[in-house]
Amino acid sequence: ARAMRFFKPDPVPSELIEKVLWAATRASSPNNTQGWDFIVVTDPEVRKQLGDLFLPFAERVSKFPDPGNDTDRRTLKGAQNLGANMGNFPCIIFVCGRNIYPADNPREPFMYSAVYAASQNLIVAARALGLGAAFTTLHGMVEQQIRTILSIPDEMYIGTTIPLGYPDGPEGPVSRKDISEV
């Protein structure tokens, strides 16, 4: 599914949020542990607090040198928009995980395999419902502040940050390498 990094300000109905979360929870997980949690942020004040944390990222990206090709320019523009407008997007979903598998010796790679599968399902479902989403790990730069704002306990890992909304831009197919090249 194509990553969408530009969104209209229109709110996402709770029914659609529930549908993408349902799809996310159909993902595979080690031994069917389903060790994921979803934090959905739609409150404008909380979104603004979170958005303010990402502004320095947008500023930093704005100073990157011109990459020299249109594809990379679009990617940089999208990344800058994510940082500059995260707080303006109608919905932000944090896909979190609990390190619970195997029970006798939990290891992070197992937890992330479930979180990333759930995140991908969420994004594909969003596209099928006419929504846009982007898989990001921007939270890594400001994780402690996010944990404080959202009261996320230390034993819960933040795996992905997914802005969700109605696309405001191209919605065409993704361009990928031919199968023979991978």
Mark where each language-model region is.
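Glycine-rich, charged/polar anion/phosphate-binding loops
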Residues: 22-26, 76-81, 146-149, 169
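Glycine/small-residue-rich phosphate/adenosyl-binding loop
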Residues: 34, 40-115
